[in-house]
Amino acid sequence: MNQEEFKQYISYAIEDYAKDKIASGNWSEDEAIDLSRESFARLLPKDEKTENNHLLSIFHNDILVGMIWISQKAPTKPNEGFIYDFVIFEQYQGQGHGKKAMKEAEIIAKELGMNKIGLNVFGHNKIARGLYEKMGYEITNITMSKTI
């Protein structure tokens, strides 16, 4: 991902993450954008050049259809990765781009020395959950809540 692609991605991602955190009941609408900005600033202090973070643009026929962000978990566990974000833009969903991109991301992760990848998916994101399950990802933790 180059600097221009990162600028496009980060403005989209901050808003999208804020919406997901609101939908999941974690954040209020009043605080969501600020908290989302803070999260991205903390995780990507050097933007697309942040060490051990690999932000990849996903193209189909020279058209940007999405992106994926893979991070090596920690210096003490360089063989473990974490997918912080994975987006196929809405107009390109359901066309096989997600499955293809996940397969390619796994190849890249292996080339970087990773042998395990984790990710988080919001409970309300049934489409993403379905894709990850089809790709062989297994549930390792479940957080549940109830409004009373």
List each model region and its residues.
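Active-site acidic-Proline motif in GNAT/NAT acetyltransferases
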Residues: F89-Q91, Q95, G123-H124
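Acetyl-CoA-dependent GNAT
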Residues: Q3-F89, I139-I148
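Conserved acetyl-CoA pyrophosphate-binding loop and the N-cap/start of the following alpha-helix
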Residues: Y92, G96-E104
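Residues that form or flank phosphate/diphosphate-binding pockets in enzymes
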Residues: P78, G96, I127
